[in-house]
Each structure stands twice: as structure tokens, then as C-alpha cells.
Design a protein with these regions (language model features):
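RNase H-like nuclease fold core
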Residues: 2-6, 11, 15-105, 109, ...
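Extended amphipathic alpha-helical interaction segments
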Residues: 113-173
Length: 173
């Protein structure tokens, strides 16, 4: 394997940290029509204790008016919570994001209220993965694959008419 000295790692980290700080504080567009918010659980080594701990990495992914995706921010905390999400939303607002039309979130308690505190006009939508998971709570294990396939026909439909037809088929099944 490749041997890398601790000094080299420190120099590379120091060089990258300045760029990361600049990226994290950069100005944002005033409007992102869609912003997807999610938190991921990752293992991170604590710099002081050197102990590896599970942490939540909060992610805000904006979709621009022309459909481009842009990571708006990454934040790290001990675990996911609506209170910390509010601080993330405040950071986005302080960096120039004035309006969001639709947010896509998981079902975290208090998250929708945090969004409305920062962006009162934003519509809040539960992400499709969480919607499907919620629906599957009411389905037997043996029926779950068929239900997922039927739901996929609805949410992946190319037109409203196709989605309505798939929904009608689902209701009749």
C-alpha cells in the first residue's frame, strides 16, 4: 500500500479546509424552485478523542429553474432533529436563499414547521421513498412487491392522465 505521512495529511487537510469554508459560506441564488432535504447517518472519527461515532450529515440539494442540481449545504450534528434543521434553513436564508417553492423531506416530526418558520410560502412534500414506506405499513409482506410496482406506475407516469389511469387501476385492484 501507499505510505502517507501524518504531516502530508495535515497539509492536504489544511489546504482543503479553506476551500470548504469558502464553499460553505458562498452566496446562493435567491430562488430554488425545489429543495430536497435529507440527513444521512455516517461514521466520523472525533478529532480529539479519535473515537469513531455515528453522526448525522444534513444535506440540502437545490434544483435550479433549468433543472440543474446543486448542493446548497452540508452540516454535521450528533443526530437528526427539527431544531438543527431550522439552523440549517437559517444558514441558507443568510446566504441569500429567499424563496423555495417546494421542499421534499422525510417524515421527521417538526420538520415541516421548521421549514414554514424560515420559508412560510414553501410547499412541503414527503419524499416518495418515505411515502411508499408509509403505505407499506398497511400491506402484508406477500403483497408488498406488487403494491410497490403499482405505486411506481403512478409516481413515474409521464403525464397526469397516465398517473390518473394508474391510480384508477390501483384503486380497482
Amino acid at each position: 500500500g501507499l505510505e502517507v505521512s501524518p504531516d502530508l495529511i495535515s497539509r492536504v487537510t489544511d489546504a482543503v479546509l479553506d476551500e470548504v469554508k469558502e464553499w460553505r459560506s458562498r452566496a446562493l441564488d435567491a430562488v430554488y424552485p425545489i429543495v430536497i432535504f435529507d440527513a444521512l447517518r455516517v461514521k466520523i472519527r472525533d478529532k480529539d478523542s479519535r473515537i469513531v461515532k455515528n453522526k448525522a450529515v444534513y444535506l440540502a440539494l437545490g434544483v435550479t429553474g433549468d433543472g440543474q442540481r446543486e448542493v446548497l449545504g452540508l452540516w454535521i450534528a450528533e443526530n437528526e432533529g427539527a431544531k438543527f434543521w431550522l439552523s440549517c434553513l437559517t444558514d441558507l436564508k443568510n446566504r441569500g436563499l429567499r424563496d423555495i417553492f417546494v421542499t421534499c423531506i422525510d417524515g421527521l416530526s417538526g420538520f415541516a414547521e421548521a421549514i414554514h418558520a424560515a420559508y412560510p410560502e414553501a410547499k412541503v412534500q414527503l419524499c416518495i421513498v418515505h411515502l411508499v414506506r408509509s403505505a407499506l405499513r398497511y400491506v402484508t409482506t406477500e403483497d408488498s412487491k406488487a403494491v410497490v410496482a403499482d405505486l411506481k406506475k403512478i409516481y413515474q407516469a409521464a403525464t397526469v392522465v397516465e398517473a390518473e389511469d394508474a391510480l384508477d387501476d390501483f384503486a380497482q385492484a
